[in-house]
């Protein structure tokens, strides 16, 4: 196509040319016309647009492929583009030409636009986009105003197109380039085009997307934007405001003579990032020190030394940054020992280091973000709501201006539409099966197919029906409706229809086979009853499938089978009752027999009531899985007021009583009672967000209470289970998703972790072109987060690019020998390492990746050829904490189970620390970043037990496996304590005083290491027993040089261990060998009655008791994690193993302590078995 640049250039055909004025005035031979002589008769507004259009830059119509006649006749008048042979003619003005289009007026504007751009593809011009999503329509309305048409969902017949001059104008809205760039960046971060995602959105998901934007906009206006309250300001996590320093820690610090190390540099050095030659001041440890008081002491010492910088302004403020990390301690009400980073250093016998930073320089990195750009789909949604006459916006405020957020939450239509309430219906639920499609039944004439229907709420089945058996080759039913024993007035608003399709042989009483299953809510996203005929795509009957998932298999994953059913219609829209109707019913109902219940105001009188013991007995019976009889359910229901005020966690029990959900009066009262319900525990709230509760009212209540209880310090521990809770949501718009979005926008670190965990989720769902409902929901949540945090997009983009490059390299080196692969890795890194430097670590943004150390990059020897990479830690004084950031990149392993175990370990660590027990756990970071792709933090200065075992030869390795003191000897060596022969040679050159000082320091270091080993052994013994971690051998047990013991590689959990000849290899409850006990006893032989081992046993029992007190929380966490569909966490038996190790049937702390004391004795007496396994492992792998 040749291009014309002059404003006077006209469209040209092969036989002649006419000006733009003629083109606008003429509509072709078959079109309606206005005067071709004068355009001045048009409306003045339109005349202005015509004149502006005439002055555009435009091309000629001479096309290389000869298709120019598509738009112009030989006479120079535009041909009609035919979309529909019997439609109306509409003129569409593009930025660079005009086209006349014959189309049906019933076509949606979005479809019209997409088809039009496909037809005019030969007319594309380089300076203009030919993507339909980059344009919106404008028209001249009845008031003579130029109006933008943002709602693409309406048909052309709804537009104000004048019969004498039907014309539409296409234009690119203001800011379209920024929107395009933003969409492109977000698409890159997601790994999937937003344009394609938009095309796949149905009406519910478009509403969800607009709601997410409204929440994003509201949150961004209210979150911290300045100073230390800035949403990205990295305050170090702390345990509890006002908490005193534990006495044990205080004694440990004083014995080790620890102090605070303060580092200061001049302003110019800080600006340039120079960390060498920093001034150091040591300040004596004070258990009551706060950041404010420590700074005050430091500045006082500086004045005494007469040290200052003339470049600093007189009013300069100061921050304390933890050495080696981008985290600060600034809260004046929090003691330093309550900060996690400070306490960990003290517990490890290390002096906490602080870099004193200038506030003015630090806060430059946390400036106010630029205003949000309102995306085009929001304006489209506002217009749609206005045209649909829907009344309430997302934030329940009336529309103030055309720029406000009109996004719907109250989905009820206006009175002009025919509608009734569910409570107006006087009928039972009726459903008709229609047919089964998309499934190839076995070619056997005797095959039948049938459907099982059930209506449920949570774990309760309210009604069920099984259809007649029909011939599988036809798989069609007659027009008979099946009537369910479910009165419509009593149908709960969150009732779910479960459909299961089965087939088998007619003449044989053999096992039936499952075609598939699907669960669908009986109400739609508008909160209206589903009516009419529906086609639902079934889920394949996979063994690990999440059968609680609500929604169809829209992506056709695993099967193309579908079922068509018809739900009885009532001649109009049927809406669910509102909260006001529930309240009215409860207040004015005429039957009061069940309202005379235990009120619960006086706790003492309640527990003395004879019915209380029966209540406790029934609760235990229910929790054991036994279904309560109706009279027993009534007894529990009579105690609802007591439960509301005294035992709010029993809401779980009430929500699982069939008695509640089969009568609208009962669940209406429960809804009303929730308004004044005492907050349940975190464990109970998480349980209510799992598969046991599908009711949206109760789930909303649980989210609200969870949001109140989880502080910013602890919220990150629950991101993973809350993501799984999303999978149990019946609708796209959920309170769980909104809470995750809000928290992520208000805390950069939460947002960073949420993004990567969500990206790993959608990576597993990216295996087909038709994206699943779950994929689209999560993608929209991620998009909303990135739109609200544009600054994070730049960081995420670099990290995504890093993952892509490492994936490419790991694939490249997979088939190579280890040494050759390492050389190839380093060659590749030399050309791209600059792309992976000077950025936040994907594992934890508090660490800054500096220069990559290419010579330390290696390919590990395992089958998947993981890559081990090292960077310099760019944070100041990183030598005190973590000089290098090392990580392993894995391509081909599913890291989700490891991440689950380590997340639970982090929760345990947090709970133990809150109970003043520091078990020195090392929950290193693991981050899945895609399908079978992820990175693992490398813990520095450590070795596996096997590496410690390996000596100078085969026999030496075998002997060390048997030698109970080899671990203790290794620890002594790391502390500088040599064996007697080596020691005598070295000491011969030193005087006696030097010898004594060196020996004292080495022994002090050794005993500190033994103490670390003791507490870490306590933590991992209890944790691995509770989680049933198996396949423990000397290659996945590690020891740091300072004595910390920890586990890696969690391939087998919840009792799933390796077996040989049907016998499990790991027969001990947890690892406790003679080698460990020798270290605990500081090298002395094992004696179970010794003070050291009795102390170890006591600590183990105390640590277990703390976990037992929180048993409900762990059961809730693992129950939610069923949504991950891991092979070893997928069944009730897996959860039963956890309940067994947590001694959930125990009724008292004494019983729990006695239970674990028995477990300890079993591990102690069976230590020889583990020792033998280690010997065979060493011999096999040497």
Curated annotation (Swiss-Prot):
Q: Report if keyword Nucleotide-binding is assigned.
A: yes
* One Gene Ontology CC term in the entry: non-motile cilium
| Domain called PI3K/PI4K catalytic: residue spans | 853-1168
Q: Which residues form the PI3K-RBD domain?
A: 266-358
Instruction: Please name the GO terms of the biological process aspect recorded for this protein, alphabetically.
Output: cell migration; cellular response to salt; chemosensory behavior; chemotaxis; dauer entry; dauer larval development; determination of adult lifespan; embryo development ending in birth or egg hatching
The record ties this protein, via Pfam families, to: PI3_PI4_kinase, PI3K_C2, PI3K_p85B, PI3K_rbd, PI3Ka
Query: Per the database record, which ranges form the C2 PI3K-type domain?
Result: 425-577
Report the sequence similarity comment from the record: Belongs to the PI3/PI4-kinase family.
Briefly, what is this protein's role? Phosphatidylinositol 3-kinase homolog that regulates longevity and diapause. Promotes cell survival during embryonic development by recruiting akt-1/2 to the plasma membrane through the production of PtdIns(3,4,5)P3. Could function in the development or neuroendocrine signaling of the dauer pathway. Mediates susceptibility to enteropathogenic E.coli infection. May negatively regulate AYI interneuron neurite outgrowth. Plays a role in aversive olfactory learning when an odor is associated with food deprivation.
Q: What is this protein called?
A: Phosphatidylinositol 3-kinase age-1
């Amino acid at each position: 196509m040749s291009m014309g640049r002059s404003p006077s250039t006209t469209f040209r055909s092969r036989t002649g040319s006419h000006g733009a004025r003629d083109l606008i005035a003429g509509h072709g031979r078959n079109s309606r016309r206005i005067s071709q002589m004068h355009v001045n008769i048009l409306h003045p507004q339109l005349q202005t647009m015509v004149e502006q259009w005439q002055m555009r830059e435009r091309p000629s119509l001479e096309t290389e492929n000869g298709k120019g006649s598509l738009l112009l006749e030989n006479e120079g008048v535009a041909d009609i583009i035919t979309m529909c042979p019997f439609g109306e003619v509409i003129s569409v003005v593009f930025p660079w030409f005009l086209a006349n289009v014959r189309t049906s007026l019933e076509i949606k504007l979005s479809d019209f636009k997409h088809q039009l751009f496909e037809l005019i593809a030969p007319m594309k011009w380089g300076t203009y986009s030919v993507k339909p999503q980059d344009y919106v329509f404008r028209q001249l309305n009845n008031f003579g105003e130029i109006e933008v048409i943002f709602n693409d969902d309406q048909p052309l017949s709804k537009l104000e197109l004048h019969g004498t001059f039907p014309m539409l104008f296409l234009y690119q809205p203001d800011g379209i380039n920024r929107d395009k760039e933003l969409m492109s960046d977000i698409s890159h971060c997601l790994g999937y085009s937003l344009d394609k995602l938009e095309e796949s959105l149905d009406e519910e998901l478009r509403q969800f997307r607009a709601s997410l934007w409204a929440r994003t906009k509201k949150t961004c206006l209210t979150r911290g934007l300045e100073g230390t309250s800035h949403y990205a300001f990295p305050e170090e996590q702390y345990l509890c405001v006002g908490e005193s320093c534990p006495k044990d820690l205080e004694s440990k610090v004083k014995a080790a003579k620890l102090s605070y190390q303060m580092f200061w540099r001049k302003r110019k050095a800080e600006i340039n990032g120079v960390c060498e030659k920093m001034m150091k001041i040591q300040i004596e440890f004070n258990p009551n020190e706060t950041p404010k008081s420590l700074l005050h002491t430091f500045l006082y010492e500086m004045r005494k030394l007469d040290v200052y910088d003339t470049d600093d302004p007189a009013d300069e403020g100061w921050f304390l940054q933890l050495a080696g990390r981008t985290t600060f301690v600034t809260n004046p009400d929090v003691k330093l020992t309550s900060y996690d980073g400070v306490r960990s250093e003290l517990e490890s016998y290390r002096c906490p280091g602080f870099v004193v930073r200038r506030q003015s320089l630090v806060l430059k990195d946390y400036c106010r973000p630029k205003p949000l750009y309102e995306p085009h789909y929001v304006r489209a949604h506002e217009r749609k709501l206005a045209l649909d006459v829907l009344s309430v916006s997302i934030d329940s405020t009336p529309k103030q201006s055309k720029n406000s957020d009109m996004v719907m939450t109250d989905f009820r239509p206006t009175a002009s539409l025919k509608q009734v309430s569910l409570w107006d219906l006087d009928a039972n639920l009726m459903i008709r099966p229609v047919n089964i499609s998309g499934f190839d039944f076995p070619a056997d004439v005797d095959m039948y197919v049938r459907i099982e229907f059930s209506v449920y709420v949570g774990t309760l089945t309210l009604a069920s029906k099984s259809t007649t058996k029909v011939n599988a080759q036809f798989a069609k039913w007659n027009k008979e409706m099946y009537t369910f024993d479910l009165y419509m007035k009593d149908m709960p608003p969150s009732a779910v229809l479960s459909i299961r399709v089965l087939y088998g042989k007619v003449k044989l009483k053999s096992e039936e086979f499952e075609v598939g299953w699907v669960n669908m809510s009986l109400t739609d996203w508008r909160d209206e009853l589903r009516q009419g005929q529906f086609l639902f795509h079934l889920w394949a009957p996979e063994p690990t499938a999440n059968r609680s998932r609500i929604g169809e298999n829209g992506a056709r994953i695993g099967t193309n089978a579908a079922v068509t059913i018809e739900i009885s219609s009532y001649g109009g829209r049927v809406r669910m009752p509102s909260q006001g109707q529930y309240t009215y019913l409860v207040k004015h109902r005429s039957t009061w027999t069940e309202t005379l219940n235990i009120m619960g105001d006086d706790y003492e009188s309640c527990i003395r009531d004879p019915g209380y013991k029966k209540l406790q007995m029934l609760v235990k019976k229910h929790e054991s899985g036994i279904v309560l009889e109706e009279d027993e359910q009534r007894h529990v229901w009579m105690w609802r007021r007591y439960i509301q005020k005294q035992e709010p966690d029993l809401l779980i029990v009430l929500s699982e009583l069939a008695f509640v959900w089969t009568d609208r009066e009962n669940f209406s009262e429960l809804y009303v009672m929730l308004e004044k319900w005492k907050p349940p525990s975190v464990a109970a709230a998480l349980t209510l967000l799992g598969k046991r509760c599908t009711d949206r009212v109760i789930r909303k209540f649980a989210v609200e209470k969870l949001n109140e209880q989880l502080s910013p310090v602890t919220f990150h521990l629950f991101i993973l289970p809350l993501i799984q809770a999303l999978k149990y949501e019946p609708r796209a718009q959920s309170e769980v998703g909104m809470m995750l979005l809000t928290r992520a926008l208000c805390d950069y670190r939460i947002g960073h972790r949420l993004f990567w965990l969500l990206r790993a989720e959608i990576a597993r769902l990216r295996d087909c072109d038709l994206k699943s409902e779950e994929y689209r929901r999560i993608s929209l949540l991620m998009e909303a987060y990135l739109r609200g945090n544009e600054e994070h997009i730049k960081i995420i983009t670099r990290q995504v690019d890093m993952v892509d490059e490492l994936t490419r390299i790991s694939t490249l080196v997979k088939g190579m020998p280890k040494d050759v692969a390492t050389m190839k890795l380093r060659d590749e890194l030399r050309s791209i390492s600059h792309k992976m430097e000077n950025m936040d670590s994907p594992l934890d943004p508090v660490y800054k990746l500096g220069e990559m150390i290419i010579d330390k990059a290696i390919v590990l020897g395992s089958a998947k050829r993981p890559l081990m990479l090292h960077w310099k830690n760019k944070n100041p004084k990183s030598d005190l904490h973590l000089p290098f950031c090392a990580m392993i990149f894995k391509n081909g392993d599913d890291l989700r189970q490891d991440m689950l175990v380590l997340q639970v370990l982090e929760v345990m660590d947090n709970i133990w620390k809150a109970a003043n027990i520091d078990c020195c756990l090392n929950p290193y970071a693991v981050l899945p970043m895609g399908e079978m792709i992820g990175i693992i933090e490398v813990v520095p200065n450590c070795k596996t037990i096997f590496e410690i075992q390996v000596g100078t030869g085969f026999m030496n390795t075998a002997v060390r496996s048997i030698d109970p003191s080899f671990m203790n000897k290794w620890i002594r060596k790391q502390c500088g304590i040599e064996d007697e022969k080596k020691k005598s040679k070295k000491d011969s050159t030193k005087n006696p005083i030097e010898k004594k000082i060196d020996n004292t320091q080495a022994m002090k270091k050794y005993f500190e290491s033994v103490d670390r080993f003791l507490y870490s052994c306590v933590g991992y013994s209890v944790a691995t027993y509770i989680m049933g971690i198996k396949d423990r051998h000397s290659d996945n047990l590690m020891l740091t040089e300072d004595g910390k013991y920890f586990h890696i590689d969690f391939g087998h959990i919840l009792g799933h261990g390796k077996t040989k000849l049907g016998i499990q290899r790991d027969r001990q409850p947890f690892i406790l060998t003679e080698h460990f006990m020798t270290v605990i006893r500081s090298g002395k032989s094992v004696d179970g009655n010794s003070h050291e081992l009795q102390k170890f046993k006591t600590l183990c029992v105390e640590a277990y008791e703390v976990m037992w007190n929180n048993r409900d929380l762990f059961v809730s966490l693992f129950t939610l994690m069923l949504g991950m569909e891991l092979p070893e966490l997928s069944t009730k038996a897996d959860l039963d193993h956890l309940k067994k190790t947590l001694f959930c049937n125990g009724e008292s702390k004494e019983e729990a302590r006695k239970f674990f004391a028995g477990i300890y004795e079993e591990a102690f007496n069976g230590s020889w078995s583990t020792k033998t396994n280690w010997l065979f492992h060493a011999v096999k792998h040497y």
